[in-house]
Amino acid sequence: MAKVIGIDLGTTNSCVSVMDGKDAKVIENAEGARTTPSMVAFTEDGERLVGQPAKRQAVTNPENTLFAIKRLIGRTFEDPTTQKDKGMVPYKIVKADNGDAWVEAHGTSYSPSQISAMILQKMKETAESYLGEKVEKAVITVPAYFNDAQRQATKDAGKIAGLDVLRIINEPTAAALAYGLDKKEGKTIAVYDLGGGTFDISVLEIGDGVFEVKSTNGDTFLGGEDFDMRLVEYLASEFKKEQGIDLKNDKLALQRLKEAAEKAKIELSSSQQTEINLPFITADASGPKHLTMKLSRAKFESLVEDLIQKTIAPCKAALKDAGVSAAEIDEVVLVGGMTRMPKVQETVKQLFGKEPHKGVNPDEVVAMGAAIQAGVLQGDVKDVLLLDVTPLSLGIETLGGVFTRLIERNTTIPTKKSQVFSTADDNQSAVTIRVSQGEREMAADNKLLGQFDLVGIPPAPRGVPQIEVTFDIDANGIVQVSAKDKGTGKEHQIRIQASGGLSDAEIEKMVKDAEANAEADKKRREGVEAKNQAESLVHSSEKSLQEHGDKVSETDRKAIEDAIAALKSAVEVSEPDAEDIKAKTNTLMEVSMKLGQAIYEAQQTDAAHADAAADAKRSGDDVVDADYEEVKDEDDRKRSA
């Protein structure tokens, strides 16, 4: 039975895990790392790089290196969050035909789901390489506070990557699974998850295989990226004061600043001070300029103090919704790379009145939880019951633009809820049902998930027709809405059409593009491997010919030289053809056989001569000079006596 993998699709880094017996195992990628940067780059020659290779070239190719794409997934272009993000990244964020936020690289537009799919493909390949078999099913994690559009877009990304997404699971819930799988006694825990781009807080009751989420809260635009940008802004402003040059106008310098900020942030988690040193960051008429600055932990903490404080209100709201006090929380589990920051740990300690639990790896625990959930779905992990909640209230817009809730936030999912509505005018034959998600009292202030028209209502006075609207939330937290005209008995099963999002046709096209790209990537990799093998063979053949060319006939020597030249030509073209290189590699190997044979025979002859010489030396050495003493015979002995 094929394995189901667990993937933590992160803002900054992603991680893949699989059940190995009773334990979740994190799989190392091709570069030997346990996490993979969530970055995709497009080079000048059309090559697509994912993960560490993309990160390595980001400084020289900032406009076509896409990172923190998770912050855009499921968002519209006009969303204030998107507009804020536009000013923070060097790449282009553009408006798609459906109003969604897309990104652009080398003049081509991509949806965030497409870019996320490229990262998921990398995780899929990592798992396949380890398992030695095809992987087609996965459990993917999302921030607990993701809305329906963001969850649907994540599921679309999985489909584009060629994965059947069995379940979308909330990140704090996944972390709780990994933390509490072996815990038998009942506990109330809080999972404080501050990652690269999002913040979640979940309160759970766990014990004896049951994981029940009591409440969840968070901020989908608060994480390590914001901490990095604070430091970038500070470095740029200090440099401007000293040199009078604004580095924020230079995308290449900005990318170098971002990398330096991330490195400094990490170093300050374990040391009190760090030095940022960026030579040749820019230049003016007087010559090149260098940025050198010492940064203390205290200064960094003061720069990001308000960001850390922004996590407190969601924590208090989650505790209130769960009906527990901070003192009643038995354990606070830290998740996400940012929780390594001492100031964050100190804030959590002050808020909950206890030392947070640091026994899990904050970068890997979410992927491990996803793998455990995959094991549950596959039947490999027994006696585990997971009860999650919907993070935001769901409802429809009613008369006067009021948001009428059908399903309150923190309702256990899956769930189904119906409510009867009616018409606002006499003889109204159609109603538009606008579905929203959020906590504000007016529908316009919440996230519009979609709308649909229910037509064919028989003429009647206002308030008479009875229209039953049913909300159905599945275990992934994804919403379906249906409507039924109770007067006529006609039922309308309506699949909600998101106000943005990808259509089925677009997803299908992207799936085909991804498959084509995977094939192109495979061919490119085969080309590189064939080229490496060919260059190695050319080098060894030239060396052998130079040293032993006199051992073969002129005809054979010429054949080898021609084969080397042909293989060199095949390798040196801009778009090497793997099949052509392989064929010419085989030709060179065949014609070189006579040279190899001649070298072997010469070695055999030399070895035979050496053996004969050694034997001759040994036979000469067998003559031994001996000391002797003369022994007189019996008569001589008698006479001398």
From Swiss-Prot:
Residues 514-529, 540-554, 608-621 have a biased composition (Basic and acidic residues). Induction: By stress conditions e.g. heat shock. The modification Phosphothreonine is found at T198. Residues 514-554, 604-641 are annotated as: Disordered. Residues 622-633 have a biased composition (Acidic residues). Signal peptide: none annotated. PROSITE patterns: HSP70_1, HSP70_2, HSP70_3. Pfam families: HSP70. It comes from the Bacteria. The keyword Chloroplast does not apply. The keyword Oxidoreductase does not apply. Keywords: ATP-binding, Chaperone, Nucleotide-binding, Phosphoprotein, Stress response. GO terms for molecular function: ATP binding; ATP-dependent protein folding chaperone; unfolded protein binding. SUPFAM superfamilies: Actin-like ATPase domain (SSF53067), Heat shock protein 70kD (HSP70), C-terminal subdomain (SSF100934), Heat shock protein 70kD (HSP70), peptide-binding domain (SSF100920). InterPro entries: ATPase_NBD (IPR043129), Chaperone_DnaK (IPR012725), Heat_shock_70_CS (IPR018181), HSP70_C_sf (IPR029048), HSP70_peptide-bd_sf (IPR029047), Hsp_70_fam (IPR013126). Acts as a chaperone. Belongs to the heat shock protein 70 family. This is Chaperone protein DnaK. It comes from Rhizobium meliloti (strain 1021). The gene is dnaK.
